[in-house]
Amino acid sequence: MSRFETQFATLNAKNEGAFVPFVTLCDPTFDRSFEIICTLVDNGADALELGFPFSDPLLDGPVIQAANNRALTAGHSSEDSFKLLEKVRSKYPEIPISLLLCANLIFAKGLDAFYQRCAEVGVDAVLVADIPLLAKEDYVQAAKKHGIQPVFICPPNADEKTIQGVAENSEGYTYLVSRAGVTSAENQAHAANLDTLVEQLKAHNAPPILQGFGIAQPEQVKEALSLGTAGAISGSATVKIIERNLDNHEQCLAELAEFVQTMKAATK
């Protein structure tokens, strides 16, 4: 069983959902980022979704764009992100790790080389945010060759064919987007049809569904679980804590610890 499958089985046995924070690797620096990720895991994160710094992200709202810029301004490359992943994996051999990134980052390294490097540093799954199902073939092939689970996004406007494609091609987990638009902790609206989407994904035997976009409060974690999802992903709200504490790293870690504990408590 993969780390994601093992974790979901463990959570199911305890009747808990998953809380999965997202941060950008190397934001604001390599060393601080490592401490931030350790704080997330040590305070109850069930898995990690991590981004590579990139100058032109499509789905990212202003908070995560700023995180990308901080890491890039600090001079961090994709290889630094891989080294950071390696460090995280050696400290936490069991935690499921997924990458959420844009296709250009993968192209820059070459498909095969990118997924090979992911495997070397202990990444479990990769979600390429801007690759539609129609163009998935090469990515899925390269991922599977290196034992990496491909993950796909189910948008709120998905038709039956898309839902089936997402369900059949995703491994590890399925990413259900709460609403159209870019990531944001402020925009906490979600599409009205999410419960139907969850039902349809399950009917096609999709892997466990994690809901993301606009998850900033414990109530939203509970709401996501009540729809039948396996958990919730919180990116902008997590990264905002980093952003507002750039001058006080200890305060940043303390606030992140409290945030993760509160969000995790909502899954029980």
From Swiss-Prot:
Pathway: Amino-acid biosynthesis; L-tryptophan biosynthesis; L-tryptophan from chorismate: step 5/5. Its EC number is 4.2.1.20. The keyword Lyase applies. Transmembrane segments: none annotated. GO terms for cellular component: cytosol. Keywords: Amino-acid biosynthesis, Aromatic amino acid biosynthesis, Lyase, Tryptophan biosynthesis. It catalyses: (1S,2R)-1-C-(indol-3-yl)glycerol 3-phosphate + L-serine = D-glyceraldehyde 3-phosphate + L-tryptophan + H2O. The active site is at 49 (proton acceptor), 60 (proton acceptor). One of its GO terms (molecular function) is tryptophan synthase activity. The keyword Protein biosynthesis does not apply. It is an enzyme of class 4 (lyase). HAMAP family: Trp_synth_alpha (MF_00131). Tetramer of two alpha and two beta chains. NCBIfam families: trpA. Belongs to the TrpA family. The alpha subunit is responsible for the aldol cleavage of indoleglycerol phosphate to indole and glyceraldehyde 3-phosphate. This is Tryptophan synthase alpha chain. The lineage of its organism: Bacteria, Pseudomonadati, Pseudomonadota, Gammaproteobacteria, Pasteurellales.
